[in-house]
Regions:
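Alpha/beta-hydrolase fold nucleophile elbow
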Residues: 22-37
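The feature captures the conserved acid-bearing segment of alpha/beta-hydrolase catalytic domains
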Residues: 55-116
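Extracytoplasmic/secreted proteins, especially bacterial periplasmic and envelope-associated proteins
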Residues: 14-17, 42, 88
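Short glycine-enriched nucleophile-adjacent loop
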Residues: 20-24, 40-51
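Core-facing hydrophobic residues within beta-strands of well-ordered domains
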Residues: 28, 53-54
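Short acidic-hydrophobic, aromatic-tinged amphipathic segments that line or gate anion-handling sites
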Residues: 123-126
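Hydrophobic alpha-helical scaffolding
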Residues: 5-8, 12, 46-47, 76-83, ...
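Cap/lid segment of the alpha/beta-hydrolase catalytic domain
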Residues: 1-23, 63-74
Length: 126
């Protein structure tokens, strides 16, 4: 391939490795993930790729891909905007139990994703 993974992809991979480790612990039935501050979007990205390994996710949307102005930014992910940015990636987490710790309103696309999955909509912390 000749190309390195973006740093944010490496971070999401590290989180996925931690999720797999937690799932393999003796007597481990539930895995909850919290991504706070700058790591919120990393956790959302990992959760979208976790294929049902998580029980719940608490995260914030501290930034969005559309805010990144430089391809050298550590959180730049090629193609992220084609996926719908953070909203599209977050929608891929449905039907995971999700609580967002920021006060931004829920995008209608998120509500639609959880509704289509037959799950309770994400919660937004007051």
């Amino acid at each position: 391939t000749g190309y390195n993974r973006a740093l944010i992809a490496e971070r999401a991979h590290d989180i996925l490795t931690a999720i797999a480790w937690a799932r393999d612990l003796p007597d481990s039935e539930l895995v909850h993930l919290a991504g706070l501050d700058r790591a919120g979007p990393w956790a959302i990205l990992a959760a979208a790729l976790s294929e049902g390994a998580l029980t719940s996710l608490v995260a914030n949307r501290s930034w969005g891909f559309e805010e990144l102005e430089d391809a050298r930014h550590p959180d730049f992910l090629p193609g992220a905007l084609r996926l719908g940015g953070m909203t599209g990636i977050t929608a891929a987490c449905a039907p995971l139990a999700l609580e967002l710790t920021d006060d931004a309103p829920l995008d209608p696309a998120l509500l639609s994703a959880w509704r289509a999955a037959g799950a309770a909509p994400p919660k937004v912390a007051p």
